[in-house]
Amino acid sequence: MIRCGVLYAYAQASSASEYQVKAAFVYNFAKFVDWPPTVFANAQAPLNLCIVGIDLFGAALEVIKDKTIKDRKLVVQYKSRRENLDSCQSAFISASEREALALILGPLQDTPILTVSDVDGFLEAGGMINLITVANKIRFEVNLDAVRRAGLTISAQLLKLAAAVKGTP
Protein backbone atom coordinates (compact mmCIF):
# COMPACT_ATOMS: atom_id res chain seq x y z
CA MET A 1 0.00 0.00 0.00
CA ILE A 2 2.90 2.34 0.70
CA ARG A 3 4.19 1.81 -2.83
CA CYS A 4 0.81 2.84 -4.21
CA GLY A 5 1.09 6.06 -2.22
CA VAL A 6 4.45 6.72 -3.84
CA LEU A 7 2.82 6.63 -7.28
CA TYR A 8 0.15 9.06 -6.14
CA ALA A 9 2.68 11.40 -4.53
CA TYR A 10 4.81 11.49 -7.66
CA ALA A 11 1.76 12.17 -9.80
CA GLN A 12 0.97 15.23 -7.67
CA ALA A 13 4.52 16.57 -7.38
CA SER A 14 4.29 20.04 -8.86
CA SER A 15 8.01 20.81 -8.58
CA ALA A 16 9.10 17.65 -10.38
CA SER A 17 9.54 17.77 -14.13
CA GLU A 18 7.14 15.79 -16.29
CA TYR A 19 9.76 13.17 -17.12
CA GLN A 20 10.93 12.83 -13.51
CA VAL A 21 7.34 11.91 -12.67
CA LYS A 22 7.12 9.55 -15.65
CA ALA A 23 10.43 7.90 -14.68
CA ALA A 24 9.01 7.24 -11.21
CA PHE A 25 5.88 5.71 -12.74
CA VAL A 26 7.89 3.47 -15.08
CA TYR A 27 10.05 2.28 -12.17
CA ASN A 28 7.05 1.64 -9.93
CA PHE A 29 5.06 -0.16 -12.64
CA ALA A 30 7.75 -2.85 -12.67
CA LYS A 31 7.24 -3.39 -8.93
CA PHE A 32 3.62 -4.33 -9.55
CA VAL A 33 4.16 -6.68 -12.51
CA ASP A 34 5.04 -10.36 -12.40
CA TRP A 35 6.88 -11.94 -15.33
CA PRO A 36 6.96 -15.65 -16.14
CA PRO A 37 10.08 -17.19 -14.53
CA THR A 38 11.41 -18.24 -17.94
CA VAL A 39 11.92 -14.56 -18.89
CA PHE A 40 15.06 -14.36 -16.75
CA ALA A 41 18.18 -16.43 -17.44
CA ASN A 42 18.72 -17.02 -13.70
CA ALA A 43 17.91 -15.63 -10.25
CA GLN A 44 20.62 -12.96 -10.56
CA ALA A 45 19.65 -11.73 -14.04
CA PRO A 46 18.79 -8.02 -14.13
CA LEU A 47 15.46 -6.49 -15.06
CA ASN A 48 16.14 -4.60 -18.29
CA LEU A 49 14.20 -1.40 -18.94
CA CYS A 50 14.65 -0.35 -22.56
CA ILE A 51 14.03 3.17 -23.81
CA VAL A 52 13.02 2.92 -27.47
CA GLY A 53 13.56 6.05 -29.54
CA ILE A 54 14.68 9.49 -28.45
CA ASP A 55 15.40 9.60 -24.72
CA LEU A 56 13.22 12.38 -23.32
CA PHE A 57 13.93 11.33 -19.73
CA GLY A 58 17.49 12.64 -19.69
CA ALA A 59 18.85 12.85 -16.15
CA ALA A 60 15.48 11.77 -14.69
CA LEU A 61 16.49 8.13 -15.26
CA GLU A 62 19.63 8.55 -13.16
CA VAL A 63 17.42 8.31 -10.07
CA ILE A 64 16.22 4.80 -10.93
CA LYS A 65 19.36 3.35 -12.51
CA ASP A 66 20.87 0.52 -10.49
CA LYS A 67 17.91 0.28 -8.10
CA THR A 68 16.48 -3.14 -7.44
CA ILE A 69 13.05 -4.49 -8.24
CA LYS A 70 12.05 -7.84 -6.77
CA ASP A 71 15.71 -8.60 -5.96
CA ARG A 72 16.83 -7.80 -9.50
CA LYS A 73 19.07 -4.91 -10.46
CA LEU A 74 17.34 -2.48 -12.83
CA VAL A 75 19.42 -1.86 -15.94
CA VAL A 76 18.46 0.89 -18.39
CA GLN A 77 19.24 0.24 -22.06
CA TYR A 78 18.71 2.54 -25.04
CA LYS A 79 17.40 1.05 -28.27
CA SER A 80 16.35 2.23 -31.69
CA ARG A 81 13.06 1.07 -33.20
CA ARG A 82 14.97 -1.30 -35.47
CA GLU A 83 16.73 -3.13 -32.65
CA ASN A 84 15.56 -6.42 -31.22
CA LEU A 85 13.91 -5.95 -27.80
CA ASP A 86 14.23 -9.58 -26.66
CA SER A 87 16.63 -8.57 -23.87
CA CYS A 88 14.03 -6.19 -22.39
CA GLN A 89 11.52 -7.04 -19.69
CA SER A 90 10.02 -3.54 -19.87
CA ALA A 91 10.12 -1.10 -22.79
CA PHE A 92 9.20 2.58 -22.77
CA ILE A 93 8.28 3.65 -26.31
CA SER A 94 9.19 7.32 -26.75
CA ALA A 95 6.87 9.85 -28.37
CA SER A 96 9.46 10.09 -31.16
CA GLU A 97 8.23 6.66 -32.28
CA ARG A 98 4.55 7.66 -32.64
CA GLU A 99 4.50 6.86 -36.37
CA ALA A 100 6.25 3.52 -35.84
CA LEU A 101 4.04 2.05 -33.10
CA ALA A 102 2.77 -0.79 -35.29
CA LEU A 103 6.33 -1.61 -36.39
CA ILE A 104 7.56 -1.72 -32.79
CA LEU A 105 4.57 -3.31 -31.06
CA GLY A 106 3.76 -5.89 -33.75
CA PRO A 107 6.67 -8.22 -32.92
CA LEU A 108 6.05 -7.72 -29.19
CA GLN A 109 2.45 -8.98 -29.20
CA ASP A 110 2.14 -12.01 -26.92
CA THR A 111 5.73 -11.47 -25.71
CA PRO A 112 6.39 -11.00 -21.96
CA ILE A 113 7.72 -7.44 -22.33
CA LEU A 114 5.82 -4.76 -20.41
CA THR A 115 5.23 -1.95 -22.91
CA VAL A 116 4.74 1.60 -21.63
CA SER A 117 4.41 4.91 -23.47
CA ASP A 118 2.90 8.37 -23.37
CA VAL A 119 1.70 8.38 -26.98
CA ASP A 120 -1.98 8.93 -27.86
CA GLY A 121 -3.48 5.71 -29.19
CA PHE A 122 -0.85 3.50 -27.55
CA LEU A 123 -3.33 1.09 -25.98
CA GLU A 124 -5.31 0.81 -29.20
CA ALA A 125 -2.07 -0.08 -31.01
CA GLY A 126 -1.53 -2.98 -28.59
CA GLY A 127 0.51 -1.26 -25.86
CA MET A 128 -0.01 -2.20 -22.22
CA ILE A 129 0.31 0.96 -20.08
CA ASN A 130 -0.14 4.49 -21.36
CA LEU A 131 0.78 7.58 -19.34
CA ILE A 132 -1.78 10.35 -19.76
CA THR A 133 -2.36 13.81 -18.33
CA VAL A 134 -5.66 14.39 -16.53
CA ALA A 135 -6.30 17.76 -14.83
CA ASN A 136 -2.57 18.58 -14.97
CA LYS A 137 -1.64 15.30 -13.26
CA ILE A 138 0.14 12.31 -14.75
CA ARG A 139 -2.14 9.27 -14.64
CA PHE A 140 -2.12 5.98 -16.50
CA GLU A 141 -4.42 3.61 -18.30
CA VAL A 142 -3.97 -0.13 -18.78
CA ASN A 143 -4.78 -2.50 -21.66
CA LEU A 144 -5.42 -5.60 -19.55
CA ASP A 145 -6.02 -7.85 -22.57
CA ALA A 146 -2.55 -7.03 -23.96
CA VAL A 147 -0.99 -7.66 -20.54
CA ARG A 148 -2.64 -11.07 -20.24
CA ARG A 149 -1.81 -12.12 -23.81
CA ALA A 150 1.84 -11.43 -22.97
CA GLY A 151 1.70 -13.74 -19.96
CA LEU A 152 2.25 -10.90 -17.48
CA THR A 153 0.31 -10.27 -14.29
CA ILE A 154 -0.40 -6.79 -12.93
CA SER A 155 -1.22 -6.34 -9.26
CA ALA A 156 -4.82 -5.47 -8.40
CA GLN A 157 -3.40 -2.59 -6.32
CA LEU A 158 -1.95 -1.01 -9.44
CA LEU A 159 -5.11 -1.57 -11.46
CA LYS A 160 -7.13 0.26 -8.78
CA LEU A 161 -4.93 3.34 -9.28
CA ALA A 162 -5.39 3.40 -13.06
CA ALA A 163 -7.47 6.17 -14.61
CA ALA A 164 -8.89 3.49 -16.93
CA VAL A 165 -8.55 -0.26 -17.39
CA LYS A 166 -9.45 -1.49 -20.84
CA GLY A 167 -10.15 -5.13 -21.55
CA THR A 168 -11.77 -8.01 -19.72
CA PRO A 169 -11.31 -7.85 -15.93
What are the roles of these predicted feature ranges?
Residues 1-169:
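Short hydrophobic alpha-helices and adjacent helix-cap/hinge residues
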